[in-house]
């Protein structure tokens, strides 16, 4: 059975983080389902910079699926929409309780995970200007933070979306596949390519 990911989208989600992650996961052979968390259930999502994305389904229709990871892109307005969605918060909690991976980038860790106390323990990172919203004992100033104790993956922002997507591939499919995908990209220096 192949790995699968549920990528949540909301009005104001950060498009670079969403699209980069989706693209890399597909390249890694991971089945991706995109879910709209828009309060009106609209599948057409206008992202933070005006780019329009079309979700596969409203979250209510796919939340109970057997996905291996739930992905929360950032973008402050999108993250606030996630934070205010009872269904989204409960879905994230269910992933955590069932031992599946929760992956959040940019504004999502500080705006969604922390206020709902979903990970009272667990190291994390996020958008640097939101550092004060994450407990000091949990904050790590790194491009990507994987805390295997609680199966939490976090990352900092649009410029770390490739690192984030590759780490999800590594976790779900393996290091070899992450390296294969990385080798197809012309990556900036400093991004780990899974080759060592």
Curated annotation (Swiss-Prot):
Hydrolase keyword on record: yes
Any single Gene Ontology cellular-component annotation: cytosol
GO MF annotations, alphabetized: protein deglycase activity; protein homodimerization activity
Listed result of changing residue 47 to A: Is not impaired in the formation of mixed disulfide with a sulfenylated protein. Has a monomeric quaternary structure
Highest taxon of source: Bacteria
Phenotype caused by lack of the gene: Cells lacking this gene display highest sensitivity to carbonyl stress. The yajL mutant (but not the parental strain) suffers from a 100-fold decrease in viability after incubation for 48 hours in LB medium containing 0.6% glucose, and the mutant is rescued by YajL- and DJ-1-overproducing plasmids. The wild-type strain displays a small quantity of glycated proteins after overnight culture in LB medium supplemented with 0.6% glucose, whereas the yajL mutant displays much higher levels of glycated proteins, and also higher DNA and RNA glycation levels.
Mechanisms controlling activity: Glyoxalase activity is inhibited by zinc ions. Active as a chaperone in both its reduced and oxidized states, and is more active in its oxidized form.
Cited SUPFAM superfamilies: Class I glutamine amidotransferase-like
One GO BP annotation of this record: response to heat
NCBIfam families linked: not_thiJ (TIGR01383), PRK11574.1 (NF008605)
Descriptive protein name: Protein/nucleic acid deglycase 3
Organism encoding this protein: Escherichia coli (strain K12)
Annotated gene: yajL
């Amino acid at each position: 059975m192949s790995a699968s990911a549920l990528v949540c989208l909301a009005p104001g989600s950060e498009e670079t983080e969403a699209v980069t992650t989706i693209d890399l996961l597909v390249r890694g052979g991971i089945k991706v389902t995109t879910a709209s968390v828009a309060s009106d259930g609209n599948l057409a999502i206008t992202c933070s910079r005006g780019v329009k994305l079309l979700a596969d389904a409203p979250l209510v229709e796919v939340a109970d699926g057997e996905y291996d990871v739930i992905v929360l892109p950032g973008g402050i307005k999108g993250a606030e929409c996630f934070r205010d969605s009872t269904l989204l918060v409960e879905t994230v909690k269910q992933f955590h309780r069932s031992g599946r991976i929760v992956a959040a980038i940019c504004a999502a860790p500080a705006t969604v995970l922390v206020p709902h106390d979903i990970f009272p323990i667990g190291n994390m990172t996020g958008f640097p200007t939101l550092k004060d919203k994450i407990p000091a004992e949990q904050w790590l100033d790194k491009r990507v933070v994987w805390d295997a104790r609680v199966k939490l993956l976090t990352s900092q922002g649009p410029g770390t979306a490739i690192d984030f997507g590759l780490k999800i591939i590594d976790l779900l499919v393996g290091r070899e596949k992450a390296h294969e995908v990385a080798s197809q990209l012309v990556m900036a220096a400093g991004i780990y390519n899974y080759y060592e």
